[in-house]
Amino acid sequence: MKLIPRSSDISPGIDGICPGPFPPNGFTVLTDAAYGNGDCFGLYWPIGQEHKLPIVCETYHDEWRIVPAFSSIKKFEEWLEVNDDDPHENGISIEDQDFAANLFRVARKCLSTGRLDDALPLLQRATEQLPEVSEYWLALAIQYRRCKKTEAAAQAALNAYLGNWAFGVPDNKVIHLLSQAADVPNFQDDPVIQCIKEQGLDLSFGGTKENNNYPLMQMCVDTYFAQRKPLQALTLLHNYAWIMSSETTAFQERYDFNIDEWRAKFRQLCLEYFGDSRTQFT
């Protein structure tokens, strides 16, 4: 993974690279500005973007979630500096206008005030910059539907399902949108959409002894690999492990899930398809 410029005062160690699924694979802990309650900031490279510089995210460990915080390590350092290295006490924010998270906030304000046409390009930019956040894609899918762009709406909804669930599990509206996309010509061979239509794939997890969503997700992973779509396959494979890790030990054993085996497999697949195991810096 491409590391921050060497001029930075912050030097994350390789021991801080998380193997996943939470914090998500590749997340690298920064001890600077740590809360002391188990939450922290860290560098993050979206899957398949290991050749790019990372963004900075914040963990919410009680929710098993990370939140985009800054567009770059430079912005993170700027935030620390204006707060005299004590941002939790001083609470001074900085501008990061072109960051995906800010673009999405502005887009939501536009939507709330009826400026729908102003929101669309902001949502497009947010998803292009940070394609793993489901809620960005869902908002975009809804706007594409409003514009009667059926295929674009279907693709955005699919991307919402295939986002990294460590940024937040997709809303059930995504399943509804994808169930309507099953007959759109370019999506008739998509495994996720067809599993939703024909086999009832949904977002219900936990509280049962068996859950058919898991074998369906694995089938979709295998199909994406067969279709030579490794990004979709690996992101969904990460989501599989992320949600499976919330199940009981007995449930995991029932589905032959072993976290160490998954981590080794995920590293190898990332190396095979992207030339980067997401375990070291370049």
Curated annotation (Swiss-Prot):
Question: InterPro entries this protein is in?
Answer: TPR-like_helical_dom_sf
Q: Which domain of life is it from?
A: Bacteria
- Can you say what this protein is called? Uncharacterized protein YfbP
